[in-house]
Curated annotation (Swiss-Prot):
Residues with PTM Phosphoserine: S4
Record keywords, A-Z: Cytoplasm, Heme, Iron, Metal-binding, Muscle protein, Oxidoreductase, Oxygen transport, Phosphoprotein, Transport
Family: Belongs to the globin family.
Assigned GO CC terms: extracellular exosome; sarcoplasm
InterPro entries, sorted: Globin, Globin-like_sf, Myoglobin
Binding residue positions for O2: H65
Modified residues (Phosphothreonine): T68
Enzyme class: oxidoreductase
Signal peptide per UniProt: none
EC number: 1.7.-.-, 1.11.1.-
Protein name per the record: Myoglobin
Lineage: Eukaryota, Metazoa, Chordata, Craniata, Vertebrata
Gene that encodes the chain: MB
Known partners and oligomeric status: Monomeric.
GO molecular function, one term: peroxidase activity
């Protein structure tokens, strides 16, 4: 399941573009997640009151959380699979405190791919998409393994 050096380079190249506007990308990822999978919104007490896409777009808190999500993921991606130190606290909080099912990580991974595709189509061709999908699968696989260590079947 590991990525080649070339695949990691594709992932990190496109991630550099994401980092130029983490707030915009992050908000768009969360909106896409919540609109595509409304059940995910139930895990976010802070955002449950946001019913329309316009309310979500106007939410500074949603933007801040989007930055938090993408910053954490970016730190993990930059480790090129050697992300134990970064992954463990994230998995622990998501398993024991937030109780986020692994399936929701799949949903947000899909939203990330879709947002990058919509914002950076010219830089996110088939090879880069395949590499990013592989990197996000590795992330989810390792999160699921950590969940089990924390006794959460998610």
């Amino acid at each position: 399941m590991g990525l080649s050096d070339g695949e990691w380079q594709l992932v990190l190249n496109i991630w550099g573009k994401v980092e130029t506007d983490e707030g915009g990308h992050g908000k768009d990822v969360l909106i896409r997640l919540f609109k595509g999978h409304p059940e995910t919104l139930e895990k976010f007490d802070k955002f449950k009151h946001l019913k329309s896409e316009d309310e979500m777009k106007a939410s500074e808190d949603l933007k801040k959380h989007g930055i938090t999500v993408l910053t954490a993921l970016g730190n993990i991606l930059k480790k090129k699979g050697h992300h134990e130190a970064e992954l463990k606290p994230l998995a622990q909080s998501h398993a024991t405190k937030h109780k986020i099912p692994v399936q929701f990580l799949e949903f947000i991974s899909d939203a990330i791919i879709q947002v990058i595709q919509s914002k950076h189509a010219g830089n996110f061709g088939a090879d880069a998409q395949a590499a990013m999908k592989k990197a996000l699968e590795l992330f989810r696989h390792d999160m699921a393994a950590k969940y089990k260590e924390f006794g959460f079947q998610g």
